[in-house]
């Protein structure tokens, strides 16, 4: 939830793209939907590398997904960055996506728009270069939590966080009976 309102920046030779993080999902080692659930492997070793690392993997053999590792070395916990509100580099995002709309409302779309590739797995998101997360203003809308989407195990856990009023992958009104609730420790806009 602390990543909501932060700015995700991608600097590539093509140009710079950025957006405000407006939707995330948490994954913990005891969670059956987490890639760390069965322990370390070659595929998920970055999850166990310590906080601030990018965990990038291929979903369904075609979508690159970006996670931020969020706990100490050896723990295996991350936050999937699901949606952004674009700030900078929108023309480049459109070229990469091959369309004018739906640039960053979904984890695969935002990775494509920002040029996030598998080579960034293990990249330190705290260094302020290449791909990084920077502080941003408090979110404009109310922060809510709901159950996660797109997982078959652990789907009942209310570990999806989003900013109401922003374009997210699946708007709360389309989530029937999935436990929409106010999040705790909501940061008030300045």
Swiss-Prot record:
Keywords: DNA damage, DNA repair, Hydrolase. Pfam families: Pur_DNA_glyco. It is an enzyme of class 3 (hydrolase). CDD domains: AAG. Its EC number is 3.2.2.-. GO terms for biological process: base-excision repair. GO terms for molecular function: alkylbase DNA N-glycosylase activity; DNA binding. Belongs to the DNA glycosylase MPG family. This is Putative 3-methyladenine DNA glycosylase. It comes from Rubrobacter xylanophilus (strain DSM 9941 / JCM 11954 / NBRC 16129 / PRD-1).
């Amino acid at each position: 939830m602390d990543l909501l309102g932060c700015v995700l920046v991608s600097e590539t030779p093509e140009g710079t793209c950025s957006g405000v993080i407006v939707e995330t999902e948490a994954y913990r080692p005891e969670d059956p939907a987490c890639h760390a659930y069965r322990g370390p492997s070659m595929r998920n070793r970055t999850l166990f590398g310590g906080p601030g690392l990018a965990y990038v993997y291929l979903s369904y053999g075609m979508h690159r997904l970006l996670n931020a590792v969020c706990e100490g070395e050896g723990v295996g916990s991350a936050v999937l960055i699901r949606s952004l509100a674009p700030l900078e580099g929108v023309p480049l995002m459109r070229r990469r996506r091959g369309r004018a709309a739906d640039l960053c409302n979904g984890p695969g779309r935002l990775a494509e728009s920002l040029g996030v590739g598998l080579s960034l797995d293990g990249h330190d998101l705290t260094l302020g270069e290449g791909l990084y997360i920077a502080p941003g203003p408090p979110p404009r809308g109310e922060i809510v939590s709901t159950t996660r989407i797109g997982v078959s195990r652990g789907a009942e856990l209310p570990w999806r966080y989003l900013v109401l009023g922003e374009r997210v992958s699946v708007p709360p009104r389309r989530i029937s009976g999935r436990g929409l609730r106010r999040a705790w420790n909501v940061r008030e806009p300045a």
